[in-house]
Amino acid sequence: VKPFIGLGGLQHGFTDQDTVIQDPGYFRLPGVRYRWGDYTLRTAIGGGHGETNLQRAIFQSCDTFFYDLGYRMGIDTIHSFLGQFGFGQNFTLDVGYARTGVLPSREWKQATRNEPWYPGDTINSSIGQGYMWATPLQLATATAIAANKGVVVKPRMLAAVDGEPFEPQDLNPVADVQIDNPDNWRYIEESMTMVVHRPYSQVFRDYGTAYEAIARADREMSYKMAGKSGSAQVVSIAQDILQSEDIDVSDLNKDHALFVAYAPAQHPTIKPQIAVAVFVENGQHGSSVAGPVAKAVIDAYLLDILQIDFTSLATDPDALLSFDAGRAPQQSTDPAAGFLTLANAEHEGHVHD
């Protein structure tokens, strides 16, 4: 959920593209000794990410930046903003049994737990932990909305009945997501693209969390993909928060691996055509385990089914005419044209990242 928290922070003025924080590797509430550790650093570099802005916080998956941002945003802002992307709701057109997940709020906790909302609950929610949980279908839907720069495309199961195209009626229409500064959409897309495409920087000593795994994939990347790695909790990460070095869990208790992505990203002429959410049970690492699966699915759709030759499009303007004419859904001024979402709706989990 980090890209969505970041976009919400930009929209509501709690951060901007130039804001930099000093990340020591943990976050503390004012006057509280307890530390929320940076989960992504426990088995990585340790010691914090140092100076970090929102873009680096996304492509490096910096928990501490989002602890700070989420705390300042507050749960009311987080709840209302993430709800626009389908979290906590059934956004499908014809899947009545789809799980709604939980997008927690003060009212939800009081009603279900008979407890007040605490600041620590907000910090957990800022990285998709705590009481929040979502299905892969919700993650794919939210990712599609981000790819479409706010245009809501609701997923559906049924395409045709007895060979006749079927258009389900939208009984619960929702408004598109409106962002005051359109450049913030570009900024978030650029940040998610760096998750996949940013190589190691000698200057900043960092790289995109999925860069190495995607670079080792079987097929060379001929297009840009925007993505975000994550994990879904199976057991509590309290030990991680306390910076424990001796965590021993069975394979069945390992976190599930998650990766969301859409493509093509940052293309001058072709709008995003596909969004995916990959869920690998007990896979632990979203970037290295789920990331290559996401790329394989997107490769199959863009390169094999639509047969888009991105190399030709980059060098031959006339190639775009061939692509538009018969190999893919008609391109138009509607950013939702030809958009597809893919996901597995049967699993659920507490989403980390």
Descriptions of predicted regions:
Residues V1, G130-L137, Q284-P292:
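Short, conserved micro-motifs enriched in small and acidic residues
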Residues F4-V278, Q330-D353:
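Beta-lactam-recognizing serine transpeptidase/beta-lactamase-like catalytic domain environment
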Residues I270, Q284-S287, G291-I308:
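C-terminal, active-site-flanking charged/polar segments
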Residues F279-G283:
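Ligand-site clamp/hinge motif
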Residues D304, A319-S322, T341-E346:
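Intrinsically disordered, low-complexity Ser/Thr/Pro-rich tracts
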Residues F310-D334:
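Short, highly charged C-terminal tails/helix-capping segments
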